[in-house]
């Protein structure tokens, strides 16, 4: 059993875990402190190999896990001799079976298990695509009820691989003009309904430590931590997760004593964390860093990488992760991402999702700026294999139970649409 305590990154106090998402001090993110100082992979399915560093008592029989391998094609293209790829998606011959084609499939299992273990009857979350798909898939597999809120333009991302969507999924779409932050606002209101538990976003240790499995798997495979870690970010939760996993690996003592340098990328024109970081600021100033946020988001290559309220300046957040790892941020244009996608797919022989292409573009920028060829680099391909999956696996769309104009919709409309009495009795 992966035993742990919770500690606030702000006040450093130990906190009891009652599916706790916030410390009373309000100063920082909560972290899990695990009893197991060293990671010992278990004989368990998928990501649960790293059970000792996941904040749950039980586990699920889910096969999804990252696959880490040494690049041949892209490494030759870039002249990087020690380039490793963490592939999160569908690529059967490589052993990759994240059938939702996104590393968000690492978030959902421990989050749902943690919620169940703390008496959760249902969960609500907001998303613009990959997170929603992962939780919908896990809801279908487990029967655990989820209420998912997405902008209607993102509803095409809600499909279930290999089976029909479960009745446990209640999808609410929002009219045109609403974005991820509007979906978050509505989900926060829905979490006020009795019996509905908030998913928690970046504040949920299960979500972060689930994504941290990417770094754990890479270190175990490589027998060391990388020198450099590249990932595209929207909220930055994945970057925080990589940093926290690296801190544990450093304390483990077998994978090196230097933290990987984080290279985190945003997709222009919406890149508030990039602008704040380059200005040397801990805080995002909306009028400077995202002056026309909704218009900027509409112009992105991948609006999955958008969040108007990211955990950037909070203690234990993205800013601290970059400072602690001597990291850097990148701004990637749409054309750069499209070009990077073509380069990767030709070099490695598998399709990748747009957010992963942004990470590849950041790596190309770093190489152009003189990234040392001898450094050990880990590139997180956060999603891929979708085109391959479409040819080999059936996909069923999740149908919405309600479409709303905005986040201030009367809650009685929500309660009626999700058939709350039925939903709350399932778990």
Curated annotation (Swiss-Prot):
InterPro entries registered for this protein in UniProt: Cysteate_synthase, TrpB-like_PALP, TrpB-like_PALP_sf
GO molecular function: ATP binding; cysteate synthase activity; L-serine ammonia-lyase activity; magnesium ion binding; pyridoxal phosphate binding; serine racemase activity; threonine racemase activity
Signal peptide: none
Recorded superkingdom: Archaea
Broad enzyme group: transferase
GO biological process: coenzyme M biosynthetic process; D-serine biosynthetic process
Catalysed reactions listed for this entry: O-phospho-L-serine + sulfite + H(+) = L-cysteate + phosphate
NCBIfam families according to UniProt: cysteate_syn (TIGR03844)
Family: Belongs to the threonine synthase family. Cysteate synthase subfamily.
Quaternary data: Homotrimer.
Purpose: Specifically catalyzes the beta-elimination of phosphate from L-phosphoserine and the beta-addition of sulfite to the dehydroalanine intermediate to produce L-cysteate.
Protein name, per record: Cysteate synthase
Natural source organism: Methanocella paludicola (strain DSM 17711 / JCM 13418 / NBRC 101707 / SANAE)
Lineage of the species this protein comes from: Archaea, Methanobacteriati, Methanobacteriota, Stenosarchaea group, Methanomicrobia
